[in-house]
UniProtKB/Swiss-Prot annotation:
Function: Transports acetate.
Protein name: Cation/acetate symporter ActP
PROSITE patterns: NA_SOLUT_SYMP_1, NA_SOLUT_SYMP_2, NA_SOLUT_SYMP_3
UniProt-listed Pfam families: SSF
HAMAP family associated with the record: Acet_symport_ActP (MF_01426)
Domain of life: Bacteria
Membrane topology reported for the UniProt record: Multi-pass membrane protein
Annotated Gene3D superfamilies: Sodium/glucose cotransporter
InterPro entries per record: Cation/Ac_symporter_ActP, Na/Glc_symporter_sf, Na/solute_symporter, Na/solute_symporter_CS, Sodium:Solute_Symporter
Keyword entries, A-Z: Cell inner membrane, Cell membrane, Ion transport, Membrane, Sodium, Sodium transport, Symport, Transmembrane, Transmembrane helix, Transport
Gene Ontology biological process terms in this record: plasma membrane acetate transport; sodium ion transport
Location within or outside the cell: Cell inner membrane
Length: 552
């Protein structure tokens, strides 16, 4: 049955590829047809579809589908987490930010990295010991199942939806530039492949797609950085001096402070990036794919190492682009601007240091990056619906594995259709605020509930519900009333909320709400929930009673 379904999906994909071929000869303004990129892209897709077929034969149970049976090693999971987290926005966006702003780009990239020590020291071990498939398992461990799982699932789905839209729109624009494909074709293609990986291969296929993508991206970025350093005699001093001579801003690119207009926005952005990371459902879900808490800690250790190394490379790549791309008229259009915009700086650098073949490789890696991220997001969204809402809220924990998996796969299909539709709908919208909003909601709803449920004995369901919903709604409302939506999209003269990011205030609302409505909860249920903290604490520390990986 699975093989027939995959063949059907393959046949559905063929007209899209044919349509893509037609599109290549049509609306191609910025990037010419790159045969190497197309060939490498097809090789990657073929390889990952084979992995999906292999994974589908090993995915028999609910545990296999959600967590790959808990049999992923710490090292493999670390690579997969890095593959899940290092998006095309990280690779192209941060190197472009360094290309335009210099040192500020490095500061911005650190925002994505500093959340990981929090996950390593405060969350990973306890999350693995207490949970099974989703972070809602942890949040609802000693609290009322229905309301907490409903809140956690809503928080997860909102974050997944916003992040997914941003990735799909980014994917369409990126592929349009890299391959010359029509935007709508690119979005449909990403959506179909995303559904295939997750529906048939589950977490096992998603994990290996992310691992392969991480290895390819790290290899490509390393090669680019080495070639940049080779061009300046492996001297950072020479790299920075020559970059200052070439860049329009001169020595100002070595100074911080030009990125954010005021300290409140800077603090709010930093808090959102730092604590939002610890509340992203597709990242937290990865800790259940390993056998125990020790492997979960190893996962974060390896992931942080890989990502730290990667963000260091983007800094070199950005300065390399200043040196080798900005001064080369071959990469400029008639107006003197970079062909394809500043986000193409890393792609042009690949051409400059490795020629057409390496340009094709990096283009294919950029596409692989998108597929790996959207696959992880889709699985997280599907598990929130099937495991948290359907199995535990609607069926009160009495759903069969077969029914739960059926609901999960239907959800994957629905998410695929929704992602494609919204990706097309939001084609011409500014999607930067969606990523910021996704991190802000994760920091304002998911993170406070997870961290407080694990560490504070006085938490009650009432406090978690009121504080969690208050944080989520505050983040959304402040984002709507802020400069990005209220002024730039809705067209009002001035914003009601003057800052770009809401996390500073929405997190405060969430934590105060959780604290106040918990300590004022005198109900008998609240007393029982507090009394259950000791048993939760023992399990979170020792792992006694924690779910284990299955052996195949």
């Amino acid at each position: 049955m699975k093989i027939r379904f995959m063949m059907l999906f393959g046949l559905l994909t063929l007209p899209v590829l044919a349509w893509a071929a037609d599109a290549l000869t049509g609306d191609v303004q910025r990037q010419p047809l790159n045969i190497q990129a197309i060939v490498m892209f097809l090789l990657f897709v073929g390889g990952t579809l084979y992995i999906t077929y292999w994974a589908s034969k090993k995915t028999r149970s609910r545990s296999d589908y959600y967590t790959a049976g808990g049999n992923i090693t710490g090292f493999q999971n670390g690579l997969a987490i890095a593959g899940d987290y290092m998006s095309a926005a990280s690779f192209l966006g941060i190197s472009a930010l360094v290309y335009t702003s210099g040192y500020d780009g490095l500061i911005y990239s650190l925002g994505f990295l500093v959340g990981w020590p929090i996950i390593l020291f405060l969350i990973a071990e306890r999350l693995r010991n207490l949970g099974r498939y989703t972070f809602a398992d942890v949040a609802s461990y000693r609290l009322k199942q229905n309301p907490i799982r409903s809140l956690s699932a809503c928080g997860s789905l909102v974050v997944v939806a916003l992040y997914l839209i941003a990735q799909m729109v980014g994917a369409g624009k990126l592929i349009e530039l890299l391959f010359g494909l029509n935007y709508h074709v690119a979005v449909v293609l990403v959506g179909i492949l995303m559904v295939m990986y997750v529906m048939f291969g589950g977490m096992l296929a998603t994990t290996w797609v992310q691992i392969i993508k991480a290895v390819l991206l790290l290899f490509g970025a390393t090669f680019m950085a080495v070639m940049v350093m080779k061009s300046v005699g492996f001297s950072f001093d020479a790299l920075f001096k020559q970059a200052m001579e070439v860049h329009p801003k001169g020595a100002a690119i070595m100074s911080p402070g030009g990125l954010v207009s005021d300290p409140i926005s800077a603090l709010s952005l930093g808090l959102g990036l730092m604590f939002g990371t610890a509340g992203l459902p597709h990242i937290l879900m990865r800790f259940f794919t390993v056998s125990d808490a020790k492997e979960a800690r190893k996962s974060v250790f390896y992931a942080t190492g890989f990502m730290g190394y990667f963000y260091f490379l983007t800094f070199i790549i950005g300065f390399g682009a200043i040196l080798l791309v900005s001064a080369n008229p071959e990469f400029k259009d008639a107006t003197g601007a970079l062909i394809g915009g500043n986000n193409m700086a890393a792609i042009h650098l690949a051409d400059a240091v490795g020629g057409n073949f390496f340009l094709g490789f990096i283009s294919a890696v950029a596409f692989a990056t998108i597929l790996a991220v959207v696959a992880g997001l889709t699985l997280a969204g599907a598990s929130a619906v099937s495991h948290d809402l359907y199995s535990n809220v609607i069926k009160k924990g009495k759903a069969t594995e077969r029914d739960e998996l059926k609901v999960s796969k239907i959800t994957v299909l629905v998410l695929g259709v929704v992602a494609i539709s919204l990706g097309i709908l939001f084609e011409n919208q500014n999607i930067a605020f969606m990523v910021g909003l996704a991190f802000s909601i994760a920091a304002s709803c998911n993170f406070p509930i997870i961290i407080i449920s694990m560490y504070w004995s006085k938490l009650t369901t009432r406090g978690a519900m009121i504080g969690g919903w208050a944080g989520l709604l505050t983040a959304v409302i402040l984002m709507v009333l802020g400069p990005t939506i209220w002024v730039k999209i809705l067209g009002h003269a001035a914003p009601i909320y003057p800052y770009d990011y809401p996390a500073l205030f929405s997190m405060l609302v969430a934590f105060i709400g959780i604290w106040f409505f918990s300590i004022t909860d005198r109900s008998e249920t609240g007393q029982q929930e507090r009394a259950r903290f000791h048993a939760q604490f023992v399990r979170s520390q020792t792992g006694v009673g924690a779910s284990k990986g299955s052996s195949h």
